[in-house]
Amino acid sequence: MTKLFIPYIMGNKSFIKNMKILDENGADIIEIGVPFSDPVADGPIIMEAGNRAIKQGVTINYIFNELSNNKDEINCKYVLMTYYNIIVSYGEEAFFKECEKVGVYGVIIPDLPYELTQKLKHKISKFDVKVISLISMTANDDRIKEIVKHAEGFIYTVTMNATTGKNGTFHPQLKDKLKHLKAHTDIPVVAGFGIRTKEHIKDLATVADGVVIGSEIVKRFCQDNNEDTIHYLKQVRETLDTL
């Protein structure tokens, strides 16, 4: 099975252009962050990018409109990472209906506990949009089995007990946790948070089915040097393809 490359970008005024670059340079699934005023799971790079997007006037409606206008030009799958407050404000059913309409493959909601996620999934089950499960390093075996049983799309394993973007300070039991998860499910188990270098990728993707890279890609797009960014993306893809 090909290892999944899941880059994260901020939903800003350039996000469609950035999606096209990612789509053309090895991404399997693109994660689009919806800017939010209190992003509890985000590190400083993504938080600053979100604040800039808010100042640009980017809203969930802007993101939906841009996806609607450009969905035929994006070949890979894309998911939204959004805080629950945005979904509630929009209206749960209306939000997922719009996601389906604009081609969103799945939604990641980092601040919604598992039990409430299950209730939400029941409410929006008529829409063809997956709710992606996050599993933290602190989850015990019973909780893991329960989450895995209902997981869809892919499982996003948080590699550390911290916000995004820390440099490679992965939890010491991460690989064991990944192996344990993979033994209980057939859907891809990916690792995210703090992955940046070729060494990180090689280290984790030997066990995981893929990696999510966020802060490093957000930082590179903010620097607006597309040539360097494309070189980095190709390196990531090549590294994953050797595993």
UniProtKB/Swiss-Prot annotation:
E.C. designation(s): 4.2.1.20
Pfam families in the cross-refs: Trp_syntA (PF00290)
Alphabetical list of PROSITE patterns matching this protein: TRP_SYNTHASE_ALPHA
Reactions that this protein is recorded to catalyse: (1S,2R)-1-C-(indol-3-yl)glycerol 3-phosphate + L-serine = D-glyceraldehyde 3-phosphate + L-tryptophan + H2O
The organism's place on the tree of life at top rank: Bacteria
Keyword annotations of the record: Amino-acid biosynthesis, Aromatic amino acid biosynthesis, Lyase, Tryptophan biosynthesis
Pathway annotation from the record: Amino-acid biosynthesis; L-tryptophan biosynthesis; L-tryptophan from chorismate: step 5/5
Family: Belongs to the TrpA family.
Function: The alpha subunit is responsible for the aldol cleavage of indoleglycerol phosphate to indole and glyceraldehyde 3-phosphate.
Name of the protein described by the UniProt record: Tryptophan synthase alpha chain
Organism ancestry: Bacteria, Bacillati, Bacillota, Bacilli, Bacillales
